[in-house]
Amino acid sequence: YQVNLTRREYRSITGPLEPVVRALLETGQPRHGADLPLPGGRRIVSVSPESFLVRRGDQLLTRPIKGTRPSDVDPDELLNSAKDAAELHMIVDLLRNDLGRVAVPGEVRVREPRAIERHATVLQTVAEVEATLRPGIGFEDIMAATFPCGSVTGAPKIMAMHQIDQLEASPRGPYCGAIGWLSHEDFE
């Protein structure tokens, strides 16, 4: 059982945000980064290394991350962590179940059970789970089966979400959500 609790922190920035956003994106060098202006001068800036869900035709791929160390640590420290291995395995099982709700029976596969991924400032362990979609499954069906991603809630997902609601001081809002793009057939 795992609940991924978070703590909201607020910071005020005086002056233009562009240099701060640029520095954040350049330092983190995220695989998935975004700078979304909002009404009222607010913005969402995202520097996430995690790929929640990718669809290409009838294929779905999710790449959950569990286990993080500073980038200057020996990768074996992370690979030898039983705690991090157990957390990733638990989330992989949860995501296999989520994808199984929209997949062709027997067509959910763990492509990579656990690998080290190096980022600018951290090392992380990542898995890859893929599935072949059943015919007629659309975006809404996929999101209903998978969102929010188990790697940001914990497992079992519904119980973890209930605990998050009880224990966190405010709703997460865009934090731990998903930013991406959609086309007629594909999304990321």
What do the PLM-derived regions correspond to, one by one?
Residues 1-188:
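Extended alpha-helical targeting/anchoring segments
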